[in-house]
Amino acid sequence: GFGLELDDLKALRTWGSKTPGHPEYRHTAGVETTTGPLGQGVGNAVGLAMAGRRLRGLLDPGTHASPFDHHVYAIASDGDIEEGVSGEASSIAGTQNLGNLTLIYDANRISIEGNTDIALSEDVAARYAAYGWHVQVVDWTNGGKEYKEDVQALHKALEAARAETDRPSFIELRTIIAWPAPNAQNTGKAHGSALGEEEVAATKEVLGFDPQQTFEIPPGVLEHTRRLSERGAAAGTAWDEQFQKWRDKNPDGFALLQRLNARQLPDGWADKLPTFDADPKGMATRKASSKVINAIAATVPELWGGSADLAESNNTTIEDAPSFAPRERSTDEWSADPQAGRVLHFGIREHAMGSIMNGITLHSGTRVFGGTFLTFSDYMRPAVRLAALMGLPVTYVWTHDSIGLGEDGPTHQPIEHLAALRAIPGLDVVRPADANEVTACWRAIMEHTDRPAGLALTRQNVPVFPRGEEGFADTTDVHRGGYVLLDAPDLEQGGGQPDVILIGTGSEVQLAVEARRILADDG
């Protein structure tokens, strides 16, 4: 399937193969996300399920049967379950009542250091029940008495999970790692390394295979697995018929779907982007960003986003739009809609926010943004790095980008963060100097579809420069990442060489402008 051949399996974990040790998005056909760091896949799955519900709201709202109804399945290891990001994301999934999500927990209780009893002691199923999930346990170990891989029991649990449409489903599948390898099963060595020739041969003998044969597939097994293509073709034909009926009735929806799939913006989307008059008192770039977000949202229905419980500080709310959540989650401050909602509430879960936004972006052509303080980008860095690795157009709104952030002190003052974020290959980090640069930055970000971007924005007011006047450049070259805002007086007349070049970003640009004036006055 997906173009992989037996030779690709033989080349597992070798240089240049289609089968690396950790599957990579866009490297191997059929791989839907890059999930090397543990726990990320759980967050991605939650994002996929959320995006599925949002896409349904955009294209075919309601509760009737729809070609856009689909189910997300994810498999998690003990390591995934131990990682904090999976707990954060699972809590959000329970709050969201994601009935289109099933998580299968391969509970073999073994990690690289051996039995997980040394580090993992809670009742994981009970934890997921507390998150609000539908929980089932399938015990192939039969309480440790006899190991039997009861496929029918697992299938029954999966069917029950699919029937549970009002909450996500969690299946704890109790297994034995490396079964039936006589020496390696149920050991940490089986988790972290290959079995080796002798153990593979011994395992084949237990299974009744010829230990001298390698990569030998019995004809009956091959015939059985190839029936899957027939089932898939039948399911595809049925879906195509359902989709065609929807398309015939919804030409506008189909046009939107085509645009989303192509990641194209609607015609004229930028016509109403705000421009800001020159003002020495100015405004905070986070406030300017809010105005730009809402201008984009008015013409780009696929834009949605929110904050890690800092909406009022990050200025990330799409005004007059409902929150994306079940209606029963509505509060005095927020009115929720499970399909039409465009305002995301991640809670104080920055890592899950980053991972979920990756899943949202992987699912379909919607554009998502998420906000927090710049200093807390540390909490979401692994997900940001994966977005860059996968080339996903996710947008991060990181505010309070300097010491000018109020009374919170050094714990909230980002010092090393810009340098650390700019060190991530494939991540655009932009720090606009004034309100009009914010508009230009957002425009460039929306026009890019092959990489993530982070906006570093101020809490405090910064001057709005007189663009196109008094020697100040307009914002045409902002998309280049750097440009000459204001030349020395002699250079403006077309002659001479600068004695010094002042470089700044964000709120420091006003200091560079003032320094230029002082130096010019001094000759």
Q: What do the predicted segments below correspond to?
A:
Residues 27, 31-227, 427-523:
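Glycine-rich ThDP/TPP pyrophosphate-binding loop and its adjacent helix/strand module
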Residues 1-73, 225-456, 461-463:
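Thiamine diphosphate
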